[in-house]
């Protein structure tokens, strides 16, 4: 039996199991219908009491499984009373799969939002919190508002967490039984919680259970995008301008080679000569010219591989990334590694400064921290291997409530794009005349505008939905199923609104979906098709392709071109064959395989930083949560002193030189003259350590007496500042190491192993530097304690809850940023301290 057959067979078994359990839920319908509203709330309280009296998570999970039929039946009854809707059996099955920590694949229009209410309610009973995660704040707001009515009727609290919320509002939202939020905001709140100086500034509780709507979009499409909080690095932008001027001068093939399959750009020998002349250097690849070659490569990528209105747009002097999967612009997001600055130079807009990373995490590593993770989507089966390998989740295809009536017609392939678009327009005109609504899917903004112009010339009224006019999205989608409607949409993925058919449209054949190009991901094609034929409606879909489409050019359209030429086919005659569809699907699988490998690689590298992040965040949290930090400081002092003795004093030598050691002790631990050469001469290292340690203990005692009752607070402040300063520098160093490590493969080395080894060494060095800094500041600081500590505490409390005398409002929290968005030197520090960035993490 092949791998796919096993999966299909496994899905059948799982559906059978889910069906039996769903029948138990449905069997309780009558029992629930006789309960009063008060009795329903009382059931919730009884469930909560039973679960919350048990602290062990494994035992709690066992109780959850036991009460599932009754809890799900209660939600069905609540839904009937609140919404006048009762979840179907297939929705109950989907809910059971979600509760099991898996992914429910449910077709468009099958009611995923209502399906989620059952596992959300069940898991919220533990009191540990449930996060319902959506791809944008609009969906979070709408869903939380609609579903709060049901959850509150059942006796649970619901919170909504948005980027605009204050710290106090966020804390209240996370304290609720159920919290609606976007994936971005969750990640940023997690990072910010690990940058605070006081426990009361945290907003989140420990991560428990998450249900991700459009799970493939978040865990697959966005997996490679790290969430990053960054500060300004204050580097010059002049090299970007010079590299841009240079890139404009170059000619393809003469000066550089471009591989369309891998999208790699490389200078030729002639290009290298030109670079050396322009930048007035002898050898471009000299180690001192790393910055120059890096900027040239980035400028080439900006000019050759990225296209305006396809990969990014320029709006009001700002470069905005276009999401390749949804067609939306992503304000606030920036390309990393200087690419955004290179595009700004290319487009002649203001070049923003580069940034320095202060905290970062990928979605892959963030979501793996939950006790239980689950999701739902219309399309996930094609990525099942990735879900299983990385997140330990299986995909269960839930049957539809009514049979699917949509007809998916074979692809039509033309020699040129002109022939293809002419045929598309002709098809639209015919369907429009008959009154059948048409949804045209494109993969780029410029394609949607090109087709729009063709339709205008032919007098066909239509709406365009792309990154340039997403404000009208809900209105356009709502009208797309009406009689005679023609809608052009760039990548329909992630559009959270169903297309409902107008009166008389069923008789005309339902919604017709026309794809103008295959996306490199089969999921996006399936999502476009899935907009038609919802809930048993009629509909049809067809893709029009050409040999000039990007996917065909990248993956072997030459054979097809030769075949069409041999057959003497002209531009207006398409091929309709299974061989073509198979070739396209094969190309898509190759791209998906490449993308999966790339995401796995990102995870392998990020895992190095993940382990280090866990150590640092664990250390910070124990400092913040403990009443005193004296034990940790003592350990750091001993460790630093021990290392310095072994480093500076060679006890094997006949006449060791003690001066370097004494200078070090004077600098870090004691005052000048506290120890002399004769005090330690002739002693072995162990005795030297004990002698100096006795003096360090006396110095520490003196410092405690000077500072008094505030000493614990002083220790904690020194510890946190030292950790934060060195950790920020370490992240930046690791980032630089990562960017250059792939070049090691040319020297027959394993880049990942080198990154792991060197990353480990860098981390050890960082920890030693933290210990040395803490030792020095604890013993050597001369502080006006009341002023310094009072200032630190006042701004902290002011950040969280203090009412400012200036405006009577709570201070706004620092905004999060994704890669390369920067924080100005005088802006509030995003760690939440309330200080300016330059006086805090930017110091």
UniProtKB/Swiss-Prot annotation:
Sequence similarity: Belongs to the SecA family.
The UniProt record lists the keyword Lipid metabolism: no
Pfam families in the cross-refs: P-loop_SecA, SEC-C, SecA_DEAD, SecA_PP_bind, SecA_SW
Binding site for Zn(2+): 829, 831, 840-841
This enzyme's EC code(s): 7.4.2.8
HAMAP family assigned: SecA
Subcellular location: Cell membrane; Cytoplasm
Entry cofactors: Zn(2+)
Matches recorded under SMART domains: SecA_DEAD, SecA_PP_bind
Binding partners and assembly: Monomer and homodimer. Part of the essential Sec protein translocation apparatus which comprises SecA, SecYEG and auxiliary proteins SecDF. Other proteins may also be involved.
Lineage summary: Bacteria, Bacillati, Bacillota, Bacilli, Bacillales
NCBIfam families registered for this protein in UniProt: PRK09200.1, secA
GO biological process, one term: protein transport by the Sec complex
Disordered: annotated segments: 796-833
Chief location category: membrane
Biased segments, Basic and acidic residues type: 796-825
Membrane topology: Peripheral membrane protein
Residues that bind ATP: 91, 109-113, 498
Keywords for the protein's UniProt record, in alphabetical order: ATP-binding, Cell membrane, Cytoplasm, Membrane, Metal-binding, Nucleotide-binding, Protein transport, Translocase, Translocation, Transport, Zinc
Any one annotated GO CC term: cytosol
Record's protein name: Protein translocase subunit SecA
Origin species: Staphylococcus saprophyticus subsp. saprophyticus (strain ATCC 15305 / DSM 20229 / NCIMB 8711 / NCTC 7292 / S-41)
Transmembrane portions of the chain: none
GO terms for MF: ATP binding; metal ion binding; protein-exporting ATPase activity
Catalytic activity: ATP + H2O + cellular proteinSide 1 = ADP + phosphate + cellular proteinSide 2
Function according to Swiss-Prot or TrEMBL: Part of the Sec protein translocase complex. Interacts with the SecYEG preprotein conducting channel. Has a central role in coupling the hydrolysis of ATP to the transfer of proteins into and across the cell membrane, serving as an ATP-driven molecular motor driving the stepwise translocation of polypeptide chains across the membrane.
Cofactor binding remark: May bind 1 zinc ion per subunit.
